[in-house]
């Protein structure tokens, strides 16, 4: 029986074989690797991937699709909301970091990316189909209109590369937006920064992105007793990722912002 895509799950199934072939080529799955596919759907990407790697773990929320997938012995099916999946446990069970792939539901793509960011130490790499606008934001450089919180929060921990643009007609049903394939490689030696503090800083900095940082970040820094040098006569979109990270690390050195005290009085900003 034909599966009808469910709007509430953001289902748009990739149907263009030439695009599928190119995606699998870019992923280059190998036997013995611990691959996890998010949202396998009807198996368009699943089939050529598992043909190469022989075993595959899939995460599928749609119970009807999960039931179909369970009939395949080469697949380990996790019927769950991906935001509840413990990728660290999957890596530990496999005895190696996981490679995460998938055509992500566009309506929850950012929460999925941040869920994986929290477990990035257990990830070898990530290859995703996403809304092109999101990929552009993920990979953008300072000074670009697309550069923002998402750019900083992912680039401090990943090397990000947009690999391939995919038009709407490659899907069934076609989405209303263009899509793109992105590759995310965790940095081998990431800076020793507190992700929560960095996230708070970046959120404040970009809260009014057209204003000078002295009007947004200035008070936040004062509240944290930061007296170091940082140019506040810029807009947030002009500040490189490395500077946001360095500023966060400097704030971490302030006694009142140490891990033992930083969470005691959360800032209302």
Curated annotation (Swiss-Prot):
Recorded coiled-coil stretches = none
| Gene3D superfamilies per UniProt | Ribosomal RNA adenine dimethylase-like, domain 2, Vaccinia Virus protein VP39
Q: Which GO terms describe its cellular component?
A: cytosol
Q: Where in the cell is it found?
A: Cytoplasm
UniProt-listed HAMAP family? 16SrRNA_methyltr_A
Instruction: Cite the GO molecular-function annotations of the record.
Output: 16S rRNA (adenine(1518)-N(6)/adenine(1519)-N(6))-dimethyltransferase activity; RNA binding
Sorted alphabetically, the keyword list is:
Cytoplasm, Methyltransferase, RNA-binding, rRNA processing, S-adenosyl-L-methionine, Transferase
Q: Which reaction does it catalyse?
A: adenosine(1518)/adenosine(1519) in 16S rRNA + 4 S-adenosyl-L-methionine = N(6)-dimethyladenosine(1518)/N(6)-dimethyladenosine(1519) in 16S rRNA + 4 S-adenosyl-L-homocysteine + 4 H(+)
Q: What is this protein called?
A: Ribosomal RNA small subunit methyltransferase A
The EC number(s) attached to this protein equal 2.1.1.182
* Primary location class: cytoplasm
Lineage of this protein's species? Bacteria, Pseudomonadati, Pseudomonadota, Betaproteobacteria, Burkholderiales
**Residues reported in the UniProt entry to bind S-adenosyl-L-methionine:** 12, 14, 39, 60, 81, 103
Q: Which SUPFAM superfamilies match?
A: S-adenosyl-L-methionine-dependent methyltransferases
Could you tell me the superkingdom of the organism this chain comes from? Bacteria
What role does this protein play?
Specifically dimethylates two adjacent adenosines (A1518 and A1519) in the loop of a conserved hairpin near the 3'-end of 16S rRNA in the 30S particle. May play a critical role in biogenesis of 30S subunits.
């Amino acid at each position: 029986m034909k599966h009808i895509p469910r709007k509430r799950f953001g289902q748009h199934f990739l149907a263009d074989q030439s695009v599928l072939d190119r995606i699998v080529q870019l992923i280059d799955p190998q036997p013995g690797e611990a691959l996890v596919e998010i949202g396998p759907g009807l198996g368009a990407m699943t089939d050529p991937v598992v043909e190469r790697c022989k075993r595959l773990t899939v995460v599928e929320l749609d119970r009807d699709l999960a039931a179909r997938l369970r009939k395949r012995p080469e697949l380990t099916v996790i019927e769950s909301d991906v935001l509840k999946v413990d990728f660290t446990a999957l890596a530990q069970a496999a005895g190696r970091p996981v490679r995460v792939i998938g055509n992500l539901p566009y309506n929850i793509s950012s929460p999925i990316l941040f869920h994986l960011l929290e477990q990035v130490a257990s990830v070898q790499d990530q290859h995703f189909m996403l809304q092109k606008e999101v990929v552009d934001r993920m990979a953008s450089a300072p000074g670009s209109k697309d550069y923002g919180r998402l750019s900083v929060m992912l680039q401090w921990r990943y090397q990000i590369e947009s690999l391939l643009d995919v038009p709407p007609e490659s899907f069934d049903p076609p989405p209303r937006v263009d899509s793109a394939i992105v590759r995310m490689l965790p940095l081998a030696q990431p800076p020793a920064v507190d992700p929560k503090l960095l996230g708070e800083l970046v959120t404040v900095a970009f809260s009014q992105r057209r204003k000078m940082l002295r009007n947004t970040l200035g008070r936040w820094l004062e509240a944290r007793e930061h007296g170091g040098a940082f140019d506040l006569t810029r807009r947030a979109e002009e500040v490189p990722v490395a500077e946001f990270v360095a500023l966060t690390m400097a704030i971490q050195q302030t006694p009142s912002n140490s891990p033992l005290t930083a969470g005691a009085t959360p800032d209302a900003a």
